[in-house]
Amino acid sequence: MSSTVPTINAVLFDFGMVLTMPPDPASWERLKAVFSSDEASFHKAYWKHRDDYDRGTLKSHGYWLEVANDLHKPLEPEALRELIAADIALWTQPNQVMVDWAANLHRAGIKIGILSNMPDAMEVGIRDTFAWVEDFDHHTWSHRLLLAKPEAAIYRHAAEGLGLPPAEILFIDDRQENIEAAIAVGMQAIQYTNHDAFVREMNERGFGVLLNPVAR
């Protein structure tokens, strides 16, 4: 690695749209079916309160109650269980190439972490679904901190959890504003749009050696 390329001792991953694929269309249909809602109305209600759910100022029952109220629908216990299950399924189609890469980094002795805007029920669901989540050296789940990306404090928390200065961490996220926030706290960062573009930028930035890591 060239001396002009920062030394990277940890890779910090966003969860949704990086370690997992785009939302599963069948799960959107499951969610809409609970309320017998049209697509536009459901999406408006779903996203209206999502930031508060991710941040932890709304817990799962409170979030779905807000969605139900916006749609003028009741929220029965059976419906709540189905909504939580379908919402977990929506965001848990693994991006296997990135999951495998994270495992390779871990085996090579490079720290790996997750920094995700993640609500409470979703964290439980992904940990129940994916055993590999526990292999990460540190997890930063937004709902536990009452913070969310792109706030600087959540990036600092992730760096502290990994035990490294931000400059030694490469952060990967699908959203530009989150990438900019990571850079502002001193991290290296790459926006993930698709895997070919990601590999190309890794090589262009001088981080290509990390794509096939060797034990340290």
Language model features with spans:
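Structured helix-beta-strand junction loops
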Residues: 108-109, 135
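Surface-exposed alpha-helical segments enriched in charged/polar residues
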Residues: 100-103, 107, 160, 180
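N-terminal helical cap/lid subdomain that shapes the substrate entry/recognition surface
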Residues: 4-100, 107-108, 119-122
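Structured, non-catalytic alpha/beta "coupling" segments that mediate domain-domain communication
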Residues: 111-113
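Glycine-centered loop/turn motif at secondary-structure junctions
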Residues: 35-36, 72, 109, 163, ...
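Asp-based, Mg2+/Mn2+-dependent phosphohydrolase catalytic module
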Residues: 2-9, 13, 115, 119-216
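Acidic/proline-rich low-complexity IDRs
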Residues: 70, 89, 104, 161-163, ...
